[in-house]
Design a protein with these regions (language model features):
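N-terminal secretory signal peptides that target proteins for export/translocation
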Residues: 1-7
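Bacterial N-terminal signal peptides
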Residues: 11-24
Length: 368
C-alpha cells in the first residue's frame, strides 16, 4: 500500500466524515488533473462538504471539497461561489485583512487571494513542495550534527518527490500579509516571509522525528504551537522559526488548538479529550466533557473566551468559574461539524459534512 493510501486510511479513522470524505473525494480523479482543473460552479455548493471558515473583514469565507470556496456578505445568511483554479479539496483558510488570504488543501496546494476571496491563484503545490524539501534536506546534510537523521530526511524527501502531490496541507497561520506557516500530513511544514511568493521547508526545524501528521497551529505572542496525531504537541519560542516537542497529556490525536488573551492554551481531539495549559504547554489540566465525541475546531470569540465544537455539533466554551474548565453551550446541533466561526452579528456559522448552517445564539458574557 502506498503512502497516500495509508494517510487516507488513518485520517478516515481519526477525523470521521468531516475530513475523511474529502480525502476520498480527492482520489476520485488523478491529482494532476485536479490541480489543473478549475472548481466546478455548483448551484447547491452550500450543501457540499465544507471544512473551514474565515473572516475576510466583514465577509465570511468557507472552503471545502473539490475546490469549493463560498463567500457571504450577510453573516452567513446567503452564499455565492468564488472562482478557484483547482478542484482539489481545501482544508483550511485564513485572511489577514479584508482582501488578503490563503487556503490550503489536498495535493499540497496553497492558494492566495487579494480581493477578499473572489479570485485565487496557486502559490504552491505538492510537486514543488516535495522538490523544495529535497533541496533543503540535501543542503543541510553536510553540516547536520546528526548525520543519520539528516540522511534519513533526504531519503524521505526523495520518496516524497517520487510519490508526487499526494499529501495534504491541513492547517495554516499567518500573522500578517507576509509571514505565515503551513503544516500537514507526514510532518509537512513550510514557511513564507513574503506573502507566499516564495516558500521554504521548515521540516528540519520542527522536532517531529516520526513525521506525525500535523493538524493545527496556534499562536500566543512570540510563542507558536503545533498539534498533531498521537498526542503530538510542539512549541516555538522564536516566533515560529523552530519548534521543540512538548510532553503530551495523552496519546491520542489533537485536531483543535487555540489560545486566549490571558495565555491559556486549549488543545482538544479524539473522543472528547480536551486539555488546558496556563504555562505555555509545560503542563496541562484535563477539561472533561460529558460526551466522548471528537472535537473538530476551537475559536476565540468576541468576548475573549474559547469555543469548542465536536463532530456531533455540540458546543463547549471556556469558563472562569473554578472547577469547570469547559461548559456546554446550548444543546447539540445534530449535524457533523468541521469548523465554526462567530459572525459580526454574534451568531455562529458552522461548516461540515452537510454544508453550512447558522445558529442564532449570541455568545454569553465572559464572566460566566
Amino acid at each position: 500500500m502506498n503512502r497516500i493510501c495509508q494517510v487516507v486510511g488513518r485520517l478516515v479513522w481519526l477525523m470521521a466524515l468531516p475530513l475523511a470524505l474529502p480525502l476520498s473525494l480527492a482520489q476520485a480523479a488523478p491529482v494532476g488533473d485536479a490541480l489543473n482543473t478549475p472548481a466546478m460552479l455548483a448551484p447547491q455548493a452550500r450543501h457540499a462538504v465544507l471544512l473551514d471558515l474565515a473572516h475576510a473583514g466583514a465577509r465570511l469565507v468557507a472552503v471545502g471539497e473539490r475546490g469549493i470556496v463560498l463567500l457571504s456578505d450577510d453573516n452567513g445568511m446567503s452564499w455565492r461561489q468564488a472562482v478557484v483554479p483547482v478542484s482539489v479539496s481545501l482544508t483550511a483558510v485564513q485572511f489577514t485583512d479584508a482582501n488578503t488570504g490563503w487556503a490550503v488543501g489536498h495535493a499540497g496546494v496553497v492558494l492566495a487571494s487579494h480581493d477578499g476571496g473572489e479570485h485565487w491563484n496557486v502559490q504552491l503545490d505538492g510537486v514543488r513542495a516535495a522538490q523544495l524539501e529535497l533541496q533543503t534536506a540535501r543542503q543541510q546534510l553536510p553540516t547536520a550534527t546528526d548525520q543519520d537523521a539528516a540522511a534519513a530526511r533526504v531519503q524521505t524527501a526523495e520518496r516524497f518527490v517520487d510519490e508526487g502531490p499526494d499529501k495534504p496541507f491541513l492547517a495554516l497561520k499567518f500573522i500578517d500579509d507576509k509571514h505565515g506557516l503551513i503544516v500537514g500530513a507526514y510532518g509537512l511544514a513550510f514557511q513564507t516571509e513574503d506573502g507566499g511568493r516564495t516558500w521554504h521547508s521548515l521540516i528540519g526545524q520542527i522536532d517531529n522525528p516520526m513525521g506525525a501528521h500535523l493538524y493545527a497551529i496556534a499562536r500566543q505572542g512570540e510563542h507558536w504551537f503545533i498539534a498533531g496525531e498521537q498526542g503530538y504537541l510542539a512549541r516555538s519560542d522564536d516566533a515560529g522559526q523552530s519548534f521543540t516537542s512538548l510532553e503530551s497529556p495523552y496519546a491520542g490525536s489533537f485536531f483543535a488548538l487555540q489560545t486566549r488573551d490571558d495565555g491559556r492554551l486549549l488543545a482538544a481531539g479524539l473522543k472528547g479529550n480536551a486539555f488546558v495549559s496556563n504555562d505555555l504547554g509545560e503542563s496541562f489540566e484535563a477539561a472533561p466533557v460529558p460526551m466522548p465525541i471528537s472535537f473538530s475546531d476551537a475559536i476565540r470569540t468576541d468576548d475573549g473566551q474559547l469555543l469548542l465544537v465536536n463532530q456531533a455539533g455540540a458546543l463547549f466554551r471556556t469558563s472562569n468559574q473554578p472547577g469547570a474548565l469547559l461548559k456546554p453551550y446550548g444543546p447539540p446541533l445534530g449535524m457533523p461539524v468541521a469548523s465554526v466561526i462567530q459572525a459580526a452579528d454574534g451568531t455562529l456559522v458552522l461548516a461540515g459534512f452537510t454544508g453550512l448552517a447558522r445558529v442564532s445564539a449570541p455568545i454569553a458574557t465572559a464572566s460566566e
